[in-house]
Amino acid sequence: LPLRGKILNVEKAMQHKVFENQEIINIYTALGVTVGTEEDSKALNLEKLRYHKIVIMCDADVDGSHISTLILTFFFRYMRELIESGHVYIATPPLYLVKKASKKEYAWSDDDRDKLMEDFGSGTSVQRYKGLGEMNAIQLWETTMNPDSRTFRKVTIDNAGEADRVFSMLMGDEAVSYTHLTLPTTTIV
């Protein structure tokens, strides 16, 4: 499901605005989930869930991290059952393609890039991906979509209180800049 730009920041929005937002309506529709079960009228109903892996795939840069955080905030606040049931993952596209002659490797960080450049030696070229749209279909498949070579980070909630605090800190009215914040790594799948 392609989202257009940044999803609504549900941390700051009134609840009625969340459910009026077209991108959020599209997420509910695409996933096939509804609100309300026989036991709890406010619980997320996963009976008709269409996908068992919901993959958040954003650019590998700071803007992509911000969009991922907006989406994760939505899932945490409104679809927490999906996270608790192990359905939510984050794709990890590379930041760089490092090439020399016929050798090529992808790098997911500046440190990875620097090591590859050192290993490849002089004559190495580097392509930085500003976004997923800059990759051709083959590159996107090789790095982010191919089940044999992709890396997904499974989203888990180890401490709901701490997660609540972090989402409020990052996305709330008194949000701090998260460009320098290091969050714990998640499970690699």
Range-by-range predicted roles:
Residues 1-181:
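Conserved phosphate-chemistry cores used by DNA topoisomerases
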Residues 180-189:
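Single conserved hydrophobic/aromatic residue that forms the stacking wall/gate
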